[in-house]
Amino acid sequence: MRARRLVMLRHGQTDYNVGSRMQGQLDTELSELGRTQAVAAAEVLGKRQPLLIVSSDLRRAYDTAVKLGERTGLVVRVDTRLRETHLGDWQGLTHAQIDADAPGARLAWREDATWAPHGGESRVDVAARSRPLVAELVASEPEWGGADEPDRPVVLVAHGGLIAALSAALLKLPVANWPALGGMGNASWTQLSGHWAPGSDFESIRWRLDVWNASAQVSSDVL
């Protein structure tokens, strides 16, 4: 058996994170601390010698990815399927505003991966659009998990909601258990290993969770 290492890095801090405001697919920028966090994460993950870096096109993720690209000399690929969950009517609102307008709705959203805000996506929707990207990378990157340099990871730079949804889908968790994967801090990362035998197809890969919410900087920003 061989293993493909998949690292998923959340973007650095934004002012929306600080203000407990829902971003979704709004194109927000990194804060000054967020840029510092991105550099720190790049320093740690750069030592892993990533095979490639693929990022969401939203600026907070892309700018985080660029720091890792600068550290490793890799050009960052962009894929819109790595965008954060679209939060519909909630985008731009604070947690307090949502709780006042719809008491209990945020709890329902966190506890049910099939639930979506009006006009938005559920975690199941997010996994359905992002999982095919991983399948495409498996098919197109023969060096990933190969015998020569088996531990070089593919790094996806994205968003907390997407990372949780994609991880749950790859791990084939029952949908009712998806909320067990909690929040991630800014510029923190997760690693999954996809165990496979030569000649096997994507559906035969057995993904295992190696690391959840690792960080180059200890912080209390898990939202």
Curated annotation (Swiss-Prot):
Q: Give the UniProt keywords, A-Z.
A: Hydrolase, Isopeptide bond, Ubl conjugation
Q: For the cross-link Isoglutamyl lysine isopeptide (Lys-Gln) (interchain with Q-Cter in protein Pup), what are the residue positions?
A: 47
Q: Which GO terms describe its molecular function?
A: mannosyl-3-phosphoglycerate phosphatase activity; phosphatase activity
Which annotated residues bind substrate? 10, 60, 159
In what way does activity depend on pH? Answer: Optimum pH is 7 (at 37 degrees Celsius). Is active between pH 4.0 and 10.0.
Which top-level enzyme class is recorded in the Swiss-Prot or TrEMBL entry?
hydrolase
Could you say what the effect of mutating residue 209 to E is? Disrupts dimerization of the enzyme, which exists as a monomer and has lost its ability to perform dephosphorylation
Query: How does temperature influence activity?
Result: Optimum temperature is 45 degrees Celsius. Is active between 20 and 50 degrees Celsius.
Q: Which reaction does it catalyse?
A: (2R)-2-O-(alpha-D-glucopyranosyl)-3-phospho-glycerate + H2O = (2R)-2-O-(alpha-D-glucopyranosyl)-glycerate + phosphate; 2-O-(alpha-D-mannosyl)-3-phosphoglycerate + H2O = (2R)-2-O-(alpha-D-mannosyl)-glycerate + phosphate; (2R)-2-O-[alpha-D-mannopyranosyl-(1->2)-alpha-D-glucopyranosyl]-3-phospho-glycerate + H2O = (2R)-2-O-[alpha-D-mannopyranosyl-(1->2)-alpha-D-glucopyranosyl]-glycerate + phosphate
Q: How does it assemble?
A: Homodimer. Dimerization of the enzyme is essential for its dephosphorylation activity.
What name has this protein been given in UniProt? Glucosyl-3-phosphoglycerate phosphatase
Organism of origin: Mycobacterium tuberculosis (strain ATCC 25618 / H37Rv)
